[in-house]
């Protein structure tokens, strides 16, 4: 039966359709089509040509990876992006090459590259591994549009040759959002490398790691560099990244009472809302992972606890900002990008009413959009239960 005949048959009244089966079948057909396309002689004929088969296949991989991740509830994230263009398995021995399609290295630019870079960051965050794309390969990132010098320092953005402020504004938003993806990749690589001299060694079991690590002072210097880069990025943002309005909910219904303590934070452009959620997530990750000064440097207990309270206050504020953006009824693409920031915010909250708000927001994404969040919901609820009964958990008492 041809595709057109199948569509006619499926549209007839009374025909019961298993949409999950249909989706899986078309996904398998797409994978077979990719394999066939890659094996053709013209695949790498002109990788710099955006209309070439290589660019089309790269775009298809980005789309299929996103489709695959929509219903990957747990560590199924880990192997999906082994087919990333510009990813060489030899450069990352910790990678798991179990993708159904192996794509040769090629030049990928523009939106396709940044879509792949975002997926790479998400996969690294969930699986707690290093990114597959080399963030230190500055020519690669500059070729994709990153405004940075040869040392990887972000440059002030200046639109080229456009007198239309609306056009230049759109370029700025995209550019700033892409820059944050690059910074987030650097942050997750910092976190997943631990104090290992070779970042990949930290992923090994404790008994197999090299016994010597990076000194605490050096880890702190790396942290300060990342913190400074993130602050410079934030300070350079155009005014469109500022919230256009802040409102408070006043629901009298008991079911919505948990939301009353949160602001609704509105942005004129959806890309700004999504980017700022990722920014607040980056701040939380950096704040809670700041290395301590050397224990040889004496400080009072009061000063140390005062610092802890300041960090707790700051991360709570960033977590509430993440939720406030999600509570302002953003469009569906923003909600999809909010899954990881909401998950991080949920790890920050310890008050039950705040935790319930995160669960409501995450569950609604899966219910209304079909993007799997049940893995994040289960992880959060398990962590909260352990926090609620820490002594029982440690003693394994029912």
Could you describe each region identified by the protein language model?
Residues 9-182, 210-214, 218, 249-270:
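Intrinsically disordered, low-complexity acidic/Ser/Thr-rich segments used as protein-protein interaction/activation
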Residues 3, 67-70, 119, 126, ...:
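Alpha-solenoid helical repeat scaffolds
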Residues 337-341:
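Amphipathic alpha-helical/coiled-coil segments positioned at domain termini
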Residues 232, 247-248, 266, 348-398:
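Intrinsically disordered, low-complexity regulatory regions with latent secondary structure
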Residues 33, 40, 87-90, 233-236, ...:
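Residue position in alpha-helical solenoids
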Residues 10-15, 156-333, 345-356:
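Cytosolic regulatory protein-protein interaction regions
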Residues 86-93, 140-151, 203-212, 254-259, ...:
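Eukaryote-specific, cytoplasm-facing alpha-helical/coiled-coil scaffolding segments in long proteins
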Residues 2-8:
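Surface-exposed intrinsically disordered loops and tails
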């Amino acid at each position: 039966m041809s595709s057109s005949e199948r569509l006619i048959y499926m549209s007839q009244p009374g025909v019961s359709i298993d949409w999950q089966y249909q989706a899986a079948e078309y996904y398998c057909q797409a994978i077979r089509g990719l394999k066939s396309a890659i094996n053709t002689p013209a695949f790498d004929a002109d990788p710099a040509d955006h209309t070439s088969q290589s660019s089309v296949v790269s775009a298809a991989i980005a789309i299929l990876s996103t489709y695959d991740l929509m219903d990957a509830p747990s560590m199924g994230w880990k192997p999906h992006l082994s087919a990333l263009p510009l990813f060489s398995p030899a450069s990352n021995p910790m990678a798991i090459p179990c993708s159904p399609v192996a794509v040769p290295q090629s030049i990928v630019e523009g939106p396709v590259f940044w879509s792949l870079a975002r997926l790479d960051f998400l996969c690294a965050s969930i699986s707690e591994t290093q990114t597959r794309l080399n963030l230190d390969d500055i020519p690669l990132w500059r070729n994709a549009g990153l405004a940075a010098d040869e040392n990887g320092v972000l440059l002030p953005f200046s639109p080229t040759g456009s007198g239309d402020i609306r056009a230049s504004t759109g370029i700025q938003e995209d550019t700033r959002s892409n820059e944050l993806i690059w910074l987030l990749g650097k942050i997750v690589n910092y976190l997943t490398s631990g104090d290992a001299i070779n970042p990949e060694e930290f992923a090994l079991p404790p008994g197999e790691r090299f016994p010597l690590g990076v000194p605490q002072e050096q880890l702190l210097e790396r942290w300060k560099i990342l913190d400074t880069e993130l602050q410079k990025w934030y300070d350079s943002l155009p005014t469109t990244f500022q919230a256009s309005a802040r409102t408070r909910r006043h629901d009298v219904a008991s079911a919505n009472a948990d939301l009353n303590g949160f602001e609704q934070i509105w942005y004129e452009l959806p890309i700004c809302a999504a980017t700022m959620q990722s920014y607040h997530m980056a701040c939380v990750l950096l704040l809670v992972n700041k290395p301590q000064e050397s224990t040889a440097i004496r400080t009072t207990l009061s000063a140390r606890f005062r610092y802890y309270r300041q960090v707790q206050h700051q991360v709570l504020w960033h977590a509430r900002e993440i939720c406030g953006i999600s509570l302002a009824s953003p469009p569906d693409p923003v909600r999809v990008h909010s899954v990881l920031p909401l998950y991080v915010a949920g790890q920050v909250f310890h008050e039950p009413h705040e935790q319930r708000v995160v669960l409501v927001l995450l569950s609604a994404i899966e219910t209304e959009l079909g993007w799997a969040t049940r893995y994040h919901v289960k992880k959060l609820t398990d962590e909260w239960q352990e926090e609620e009964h820490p002594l029982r958990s440690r003693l394994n008492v029912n």
